[in-house]
Amino acid sequence: MKVLRCLVCSFYIIVSLITTMTIGTPSMPAINTQTLYLAGHSSKLFERNVGCVKTRYLNQTGDWVTRSLIYVFTFDTEPWVTQAGAFQVKWEPYSPLLRVKASDYVRDNLGAKPDYFIRTYDNDFLLLSDLKEVRSTCSLWVTLKYVDRIPETINRTFYTICPDPVPVPFDERCYP
């Protein structure tokens, strides 16, 4: 009887671990279908009069996901001028790198790079940085779930890792 209990207990532990590992792995937001909003960045990445930055899923071809980068030139007068450009991303599961193929427009005008280091991510946020150095410029992207209030742990990581972090408040006028 004790052997049977031991076997049942062992089976339960193994199943629990497998279930936890399967359910516990977060989805990479850069390659799923959710829209991501720029929630913060290093001050070196600041572009005057550029706001309302978001990226939207378009499609997937093989391992590459195509996304649009949408932003507006904000001025004192309206209407604002909306701009958009396409880029592709690829992520190998558990890799620390996010590969990017940007259009000429996105690369030349917004400084997109071919690789970004994934500092941390979860189903609803993504913190990216350049590969150059330990405290390199970075950007924080979140889903709609976190646009109004970024959880403290994510915020703390953003402020610790990113040099001269600048939060980007969510502006209702951007996303009617």
Curated annotation (Swiss-Prot):
Residues 1-24 form the signal peptide. This is Japanin. Expressed in salivary glands. The lineage of its organism: Eukaryota, Metazoa, Ecdysozoa, Arthropoda, Chelicerata. Its main location: secreted. Disulfide bonds join 52-174, 138-162. Homodimer; non-disulfide-linked. Each monomer accommodates one molecule of cholesterol in a pocket. Keywords: Disulfide bond, Glycoprotein, Secreted, Signal. Glycans are attached at residues 59, 155. Each monomer contains a pocket that accomodates cholesterol. Cholesterol derivatives (such as epicholesterol, epicholestanol, epicoprostenol, or 7-dehydrocholesterol) could also fit in the pocket with minor rearrangement of the side chain. Since arthropods are unable to synthesize cholesterol de novo, it is likely that a cholesterol ligand would be bloodmeal-derived. The keyword Nuclease does not apply. GO terms for cellular component: extracellular region. The keyword Signal applies. It is found in: Secreted. InterPro entries: Calycin. Does not bind to any major populations in peripheral blood mononuclear, including monocytes, B cells, T cells and NK cells, as well as to other blood DC (not differentiated from monocytes). Cholesterol binds at residue 47. Salivary tick protein that modulates host immune response. This protein blocks dendritic cell (DC) differentiation from monocytes. In addition, it inhibits up-regulation of costimulatory molecules and pro-inflammatory cytokines in response to stimuli and promotes up-regulation of co-inhibitory molecules and the anti-inflammatory cytokine interleukin-10. It has a pocket to accomodate cholesterol, which may have immune-modulatory roles, either directly or through interactions with the host gut microbiota. Belongs to the calycin superfamily. Lipocalin family. It comes from Rhipicephalus appendiculatus (Brown ear tick).
